[in-house]
């Protein structure tokens, strides 16, 4: 689930998506609020085992006007809650590094991306959700996406997507630990202890 970064990924490396039976649900220019609106149709309706959510770039670029970081996180959290409610494992991704947004040069990017990523990572940790940190692996000295990985400083090229694939696959393949009820010392503390 994502924006043009997800959409382009499915187009540029369709073999990766086909080999792993992944479905790309990216729409160019979309914000987290717009992704949330289509989450039922594009994710829940497909009944996947997991959903990888990469959202926030277009919110930070102010495609639909200014939005507080807390509201972006709220939209992302709502997608996670919907996924969990439908027995779909959410996986959250960092926003990719960007020094500036080519279509919105006046909007500061790098520092707000870092701040939002911290919020996303904290939310994931506090809620037992896997977090994929693309930002740390891809950033340059200005906290942007290096030229060798992007023609415009925002959208990955095929080489960058290969790096992202190597980062996300182990997280997708890692199954969460199952919760197991353990009886200790014969104490009866739960309804199943009769």
Predicted regions and their residues:
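Catalytic His-Asp segment of secreted/periplasmic serine-dependent ester chemistry enzymes
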Residues: 96-194
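Amphipathic, non-transmembrane alpha-helical secondary structure
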Residues: 33-44, 70-77, 81, 162, ...
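Conserved, well-ordered alpha-helix/loop/beta-strand core segments that scaffold catalytic motifs
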Residues: 51-56, 73-80, 84-93
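Serine-esterase "nucleophile elbow" of acetyl-processing enzymes
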Residues: 1-50, 162
